[in-house]
Structures are given as structure tokens and as C-alpha cells.
């Protein structure tokens, strides 16, 4: 019996003792985070699947894991040899968790368990309603079996908190809290609980290292009309940060006392976001009225101020320098032999680490060679790592956390000769990428309304990709930031000037190769006419796009013009920071398209 199946047996012993028919493990923590500290990696521990999104469900006789298209291939590999059955979200015929449980527990007097501290209020209430409809299955929300069976479970992290200087933050804590309180008054709320860690870090101009690749710290923030209370482990707070918080009128309380703080909130109306607040904490509130609604903070955080935008530009310059040095090194190193997916990841990270204000990578690098490139969120391990050859395509999706900005970039590189199919698919992705960057659109249009621009050239040939086309990017915060997105599914959040968003269409041919090209963009003003205000997008990312696999006959004149303009901008901005072979490589990589075509590459 392998380790995962042994853990399932231990879990079932506890379930039997607690009279539970099933237990649900989400991917989230007590703050509904996408990326979580090791302490809350319960779904990974019980299933072996380490993707950032997914839900594991275990009954006394079976086990299943639901995840989205980014992780289908990775999940298939990681679940091999375990009892877990892969459930592919948004694929026809895939049951919901409630439907599957209703079928699996049919005829039982069943009770399903979950930990109400790590499941959101909205998801839990939806599950309770669905299971009730599906045959009277009840849900127990106050039990965490991991506390009994995960004997070497990591502690909740207690790493030091740091102040994010005004030169990078661009807005004082007092100003942010004032804006939040104004938004609360407009909703007739006296206060709100903030659970989302990046929202807390942004509001207080603080950063931490509690979560891998995301500069946040585990805490809660309770804002009322008269007081601001930070619930955090005191071990994180040094004298400098404590004085800073006192200066800004922030009271400190122990992290594990947040429920008591909410219980005292009985005389006021409180705003709670059911997607970000845990079921347990929501049920703790005893105030006159809970005002259910979206937190105002993500929309504020999404529109970057002038200093944040300036920080992004500087971070992208340094990141571009690191990327050019890496790409100049890559092909000769592969030709010399001895390079693998893991070794080039280490090389790229080392080049970024040389840059000023580098703090960390912004997510685990995706370096997928050939067929591994078709795994959307592939992560090389010692077991899957492969040697690189001077042929075919490698997809490299990577990013960094600099103190003045967060980067996210994908380049697909031809390491040598490529097939005609590779050229065709690569060029389709490039066309989609360019068409989105060329967009001009009304202020307030949604990302869903723009999404088809990146896909239309692919749809005409029967291709598609199932992940989103773009997401927001934090200012030295999470590389995935909302509330805006560019995706097929309806997402009505308006796009506004000052928002950052990625442009990352891709195509993935299972068992063959994958292609993705990604820049981080800034939404900014375009023009105002009698029909209103219009916006456009500017690429913040500065790195050549590989022209070797391009079929130029597929490109329209405006697409060629965009490539030339972009590469001219990349050269002008990066060349002052490069010399020798790196500078010559950049000059060659940013040649005008007609020169590339006339030279036969």
C-alpha cells in the first residue's frame, strides 16, 4: 500500500469513529487563499496532488479529486497508484461534488464532514443546500481530522512582518482606511472583517514571507468606524513594526482571538464577503445585521497608483535584463549538453536573484520541454525531469517578486529545428496574443468581452484552450490578483485604467508540445470621444518573443507592425543595461521582421 492510501486508511478510521460518511478537503486555508502555507496543505497531503486548485473528497469506499483544465495532465500523473479518481471540472459528464456524493452515499443515513475554518461561507452553504436536495445528507462543519492523523503537520508560520516603504506603496495607510470606511458607509455597514491576506498586506503597507512566493503574513484585520484591529501572532511583529502600527492607530490582538473579536461586534452592522470569510467565522458573528457583499478592497488594490506603476516599470526592466541573459545562455547551453528542465529553472532564478530588490520568485517556474509543455501548469520534479535537446519547443512560464513590483512572463522557445505543426500552432498563439494587446475598448468593458480577441484565430481552425486568457498582477503581492480577469466565463468586473492584467493565450497538444506567450500589461487611457472614454493596453513586460518558430505568412500587416514596435521598445529600454554577448544577442533577437525573413532566420 502506498503512502497516500495509508493516509486514507487512517482518515477512514477517524471517520468511522466520528460517524462520518465522507470528508471534503479544499485547496484553501483559513483565509480562502489560492496559495497557502504548508500548515494548510491538507488536500495535497491526503491526495498527493499539489496543484493550486482542487478539492479532494473521501468516502468510506472511494475517493475523488476535482480540478480544472490547467492540472488535468499533472493530476493524472500524481494520482496514479492511489484510490483517487480524477474529476475534470467543466468537462461534460463530470458530476459536481454534491452529485457524486449523492450517488456514492445513496441509501445511507449519511453525514458529510468538512472543516468550517477553511471552507468559505458561500461554498459551505451551497454544499449544505445541494446535499439536502440530494437525499437529506447532512453536513458537519466543526471537525478537522488532519489534527489527528497528520502527525508531522507544519505549524502556522510566524515569520517576521516588514514595512513596505511609501516610495513603493504610493498611498498611506490612513488614506486607504479612509477610503475603505467611505465604501462601508455607502453600504450602510459599520465595519468589515478582512480575511484575504493580500488585502490585509495592501491595506497596511506591510509584507511577509508566510506563504511560498506570495509576500503576505497570516492575520485578520477588523475595521470599524472607530477602530482597526490586527489579529496576528505577536512573534511576527518586531519593535519597528509595532511602533509603525501604533502610529497608524492599529491595535494588536492574538491571531487565535479573532472569533472573540467578532463575538464582541454585537452592536454594529458588519460587511462580510462570503467568498473570503470562512463558514466558522461567519457563524461567529452576532451583530444586528450581516451585510453580505463583496469586499471593496480588491477593486481598490487592482487600480495601481503612480508609484506602483513606476515600480512595475522598474521591476520589468530588471526582469527583462535577467530574461535576456537567460535566453542568450539557453540555446548554447542546451547544445553543449547536460541541461534539464530543473537545471535551467535554477539558472533563471539565479539570474533574477542578481537583480536589485529581488525578493523571491512569484510562483514555481513552469519549464516544460516538448510533451511536458502540453501540461498547462507542469512543474518538473526529479522523477519527471528530462534532458533538453537542441530541437523542439520548451515552454517557460516564470516570474519574480521584486520589492517594487511582481512579474509574470511566458516565452516558448525553439531549441532547434521545429516541425511545421509547431510553427503553425506557435503562430496562432502569437496572433491571439497580439490581437488582445492591440485592443481598444470602452472604459468599463469586462475581460469577458475582450477574451474572444485572443481566441478567434484559433477557433477558426478548431483549436481552443480551457484556461483564462489573463489575470491581474499584484504590486509586490500575489501574481494572481482579482477581481478582474480576461476569460470565456462571464466575469462582469469592469476594466479600468491603472489595472495590470496578463495576456497569455496558449495551445496544448497532449503528448506532443505546448505553446504559451505571456506579457503583463497595463490598462491605460486611449482617447475620449462623443461616445465616451476608451482604454488601451501597454506591455510592461520587456523581453524578445522568439521569431524562429513563426510562420510569417500567417501574420497580418498590423501584427507584423506590432512585433516590430514591441521589439524596438524592448531594445531601446533594455540595451543600456546589457553589454557584450548579451547586448549582441538582444540586437539580433529584436530585428525587424522583414530582416528576419530576408535572412532566412
Regions found by a protein language model. Give the residues of each.
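Active-site neighborhoods and metal-handling regions in enzymes and metal-associated proteins
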Residues: 1-601
Amino acid at each position: 500500500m502506498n503512502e497516500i492510501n495509508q493516509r486514507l486508511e487512517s482518515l477512514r478510521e477517524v471517520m468511522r469513529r466520528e460517524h462520518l460518511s465522507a470528508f471534503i478537503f479544499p485547496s484553501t486555508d483559513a483565509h480562502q487563499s489560492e496559495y497557502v502555507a504548508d500548515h494548510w496543505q491538507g488536500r495535497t497531503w491526503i491526495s498527493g496532488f499539489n496543484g493550486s486548485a482542487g478539492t479532494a473528497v473521501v468516502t468510506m469506499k472511494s475517493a475523488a479529486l476535482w480540478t480544472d483544465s490547467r492540472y488535468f495532465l499533472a493530476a493524472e500523473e500524481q494520482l496514479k497508484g492511489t484510490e483517487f479518481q480524477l474529476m475534470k471540472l467543466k468537462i461534460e459528464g463530470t458530476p459536481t461534488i454534491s452529485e457524486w456524493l449523492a450517488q456514492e452515499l445513496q441509501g445511507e443515513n449519511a453525514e458529510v464532514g468538512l472543516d468550517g475554518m477553511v471552507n468559505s461561507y458561500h461554498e459551505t452553504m451551497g454544499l449544505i443546500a445541494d446535499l439536502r436536495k440530494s437525499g437529506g445528507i447532512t453536513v458537519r462543519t466543526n471537525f478537522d481530522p488532519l489534527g489527528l492523523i497528520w502527525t508531522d503537520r507544519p505549524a502556522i508560520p510566524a515569520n517576521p512582518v516588514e514595512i513596505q516603504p511609501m516610495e513603493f506603496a504610493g498611498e498611506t495607510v490612513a488614506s486607504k482606511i479612509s477610503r475603505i470606511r467611505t465604501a462601508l458607509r455607502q453600504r450602510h455597514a459599520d465595519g468589515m472583517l478582512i480575511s484575504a491576506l493580500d488585502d490585509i498586506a495592501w491595506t497596511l503597507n506591510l509584507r511577509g514571507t508566510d506563504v511560498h512566493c506570495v509576500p503576505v503574513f497570516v492575520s485578520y484585520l477588523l475595521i470599524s468606524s472607530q477602530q482597526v484591529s490586527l489579529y496576528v501572532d505577536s512573534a511576527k511583529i518586531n519593535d519597528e513594526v509595532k511602533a509603525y502600527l501604533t502610529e497608524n492607530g492599529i491595535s494588536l490582538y492574538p491571531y487565535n482571538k479573532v472569533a472573540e473579536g467578532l463575538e464582541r461586534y454585537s452592536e454594529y452592522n458588519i460587511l462580510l464577503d462570503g467568498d473570503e470569510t470562512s463558514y466558522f467565522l461567519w457563524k461567529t458573528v452576532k451583530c444586528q445585521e450581516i451585510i453580505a457583499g463583496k469586499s471593496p478592497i480588491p477593486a481598490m488594490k487592482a487600480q495601481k497608483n503612480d508609484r506602483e506603476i513606476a515600480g512595475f516599470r522598474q521591476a520589468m526592466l530588471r526582469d527583462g535584463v535577467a530574461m535576456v541573459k537567460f535566453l542568450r545562455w539557453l540555446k548554447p547551453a542546451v547544445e553543449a549538453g547536460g541541461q534539464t528542465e530543473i537545471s535551467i529553472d535554477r539558472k533563471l532564478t539565479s539570474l533574477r536573484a542578481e537583480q536589485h530588490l529581488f525578493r523571491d520568485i512569484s510562483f514555481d517556474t513552469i519549464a516544460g520541454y516538448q510533451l511536458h509543455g502540453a501540461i498547462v501548469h507542469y512543474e518538473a520534479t526529479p522523477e519527471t525531469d528530462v534532458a533538453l535537446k537542441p530541437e523542439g519547443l520548451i515552454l517557460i512560464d516564470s516570474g519574480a517578486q521584486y520589492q517594487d513590483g511582481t512579474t509574470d512572463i511566458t516565452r516558448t522557445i525553439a531549441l532547434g529545428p521545429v516541425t511545421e505543426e509547431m510553427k503553425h500552432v506557435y503562430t496562432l498563439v502569437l496572433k491571439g496574443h497580439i490581437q488582445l494587446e492591440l485592443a481598444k475598448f470602452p472604459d468599463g468593458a469586462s475581460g469577458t468581452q475582450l477574451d474572444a480577441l485572443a481566441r478567434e484565430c484559433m477557433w477558426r481552425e478548431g483549436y481552443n484552450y480551457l484556461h483564462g486568457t489573463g489575470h491581474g498582477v499584484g504590486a509586490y503581492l500575489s501574481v494572481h490578483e482579482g477581481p478582474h480577469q480576461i476569460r470565456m466565463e462571464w466575469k462582469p468586473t469592469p476594466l479600468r485604467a491603472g489595472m495590470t492584467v496578463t495576456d497569455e493565450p496558449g495551445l496544448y497538444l497532449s503528448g506532443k508540445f505546448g505553446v504559451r506567450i505571456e506579457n503583463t500589461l497595463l490598462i491605460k487611457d486611449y482617447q475620449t470621444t462623443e461616445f465616451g472614454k476608451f482604454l488601451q493596453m501597454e506591455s510592461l513586460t520587456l523581453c524578445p518573443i522568439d521569431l524562429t518558430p513563426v510562420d510569417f505568412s500567417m501574420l497580418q500587416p498590423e501584427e507584423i507592425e506590432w512585433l516590430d514596435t514591441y521589439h524596438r521598445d524592448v531594445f531601446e529600454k533594455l540595451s543600456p543595461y546589457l553589454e557584450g554577448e548579451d547586448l549582441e544577442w538582444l540586437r539580433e533577437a529584436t530585428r525587424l521582421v522583414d530582416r528576419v525573413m530576408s535572412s532566412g532566420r
